[in-house]
Regions:
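Feature of Fe-S/electron-transfer and energy-metabolism proteins
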Residues: 1-235
């Protein structure tokens, strides 16, 4: 008999005991049969209906990770059902490049790296830079020990990254994007490639997207895993 903490549909069950482990493969937490038929759950303590009723969680809201663990990351229809690609549609049909950059600047959005450089300024500088061909480069490599913030989104919500890179491409005038991922993240690579393939199939990536005249496509580049490989000039 083991003590478990279970989270299911925004409800937390503490001191839950699996009294009958027959039919459950615990090695690697792989379920080979349903809990309903092979386990009995006993809940002790005060009944709390949802996480929203817990003071610690009440005012917390997931942003970057909002879909992780909620939708099937390999199903574009589920992403669309959760308002996926609506922001891209709004950008392409009703906003100018400057409008998008102003929105990002006003939001105060910053990079997730240690420098915390304002994203709006980076997009503005790139838009103003001279050049016939521009690119969006997403550095999804992380070399710090135990770091997995980029991998978490790539594995749990890859279409979110596709949409974000497309919005960035529209804002700066780029029609091509590259995402740099270390080869040691096979699940992230596989799921992101599947997201790219699905977006192409749905006409979200490619030429003249939704009849707006905007062209954009994505490509994955695998890295060797060294931290220095993610430095801007090396990348």
């Amino acid at each position: 008999m083991k003590n478990h903490l279970i989270e299911l549909k925004q409800a937390i069950y503490d001191k839950a005991y699996f009294n009958d482990e027959e039919g459950l493969e615990l090695d690697g937490f792989q379920m080979v049969d349903t809990i309903e038929t092979n386990a009995k759950i006993t809940v002790e303590g005060e009944n709390i209906k949802s996480l929203n009723e817990v003071n610690f969680y009440r005012k917390q809201q997931r942003l970057a990770l909002r879909n992780c663990g909620v939708i099937n990351p390999e199903n574009i229809d589920e992403y669309i059902a959760f308002d996926g690609y609506k922001a891209l549609e709004k950008v392409l049909t009703s906003m100018s490049q400057d409008d998008v950059i102003k929105e990002i600047t006003d939001s105060g959005l910053r990079g997730r790296g240690g420098a915390g450089f304002p994203t709006g300024k980076k997009w503005m500088f790139t838009k103003m830079a001279e050049g016939d061909q521009k690119y969006v480069v997403c550095n999804a490599d992380e070399g710090d020990p135990g770091a997995f913030m980029d991998r978490s989104i790539l594995e749990g919500d890859p279409h979110n990254i596709v949409e974000a890179m497309m919005i960035a491409g529209y804002a700066i005038g780029a029609d091509k994007g590259y995402i740099y991922v270390r080869a040691e993240y096979p699940i992230a690579v596989r799921r992101f490639q599947k997201a790219i393939d699905q977006a192409r199939e749905y006409g979200i990536l490619g030429q003249n997207i939704w009849g707006t005249g905007f062209n954009f496509d994505l490509e994955i580049r695998l890295g060797a895993g060294a931290f220095v490989c993610g430095e801007e000039t090396a990348l």
